[in-house]
Amino acid sequence: SVLWNEIVEEEKKNYPDVKVEHILVDAAATYLCLKPTMFDVMVMENMFGDILSDQGGGILGSLGLMPSACIGPDKAYYEPSHGSAPDIAGKNIANPYSMIGSVAMMLEFSFGMVAESRNLWQAMQSVFAKGYSTPDLSKPGAGVKMISTSEFGDLVVNELKAMPKV
């Protein structure tokens, strides 16, 4: 919208080292598929953010890999970018990565706990690196160890316990 562009143009004056490029949402969707590395950060209104974050989840292979943050000057909230997934509620098959990732972002951006945030990201990466996978990312027999939501969480906790204290 015109108002959105005006606000972004005004705010960019406060960040002279940040390159700002206005892209229409349909073009951004195409670039996200064809040249995703052209983006470092994408800032947009909520409706477009919902659409493009779902597309990003599709590119990655699962909405379960998409943590998100809405950060304002005084307040912030963090949540997985996917919905509540009522179709899998109570089945212990959801990928908790996006929820845990949202917590990691909260630790860093709202509480300044950078080391703790990095440890949380590292713990999750370690679980995947050891060959574990949640059902949304792989099929049985694909050479990975399929785990449940709670098992993923337990493995992340074990990884954190094995790390040096920060």
Question: Where are each of the predicted segments found?
Answer:
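Glycine-rich phosphate/pyrophosphate-binding loop and the adjoining helix
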Residues: Q125-V166
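A glycine- and small/hydrophobic-rich beta-loop-beta segment
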Residues: V20, V25, A29, L34-F39, ...
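Flexible, glycine/charged-enriched surface loops at secondary-structure junctions
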Residues: Y15-I23, G112-N119, A129-P140, V166
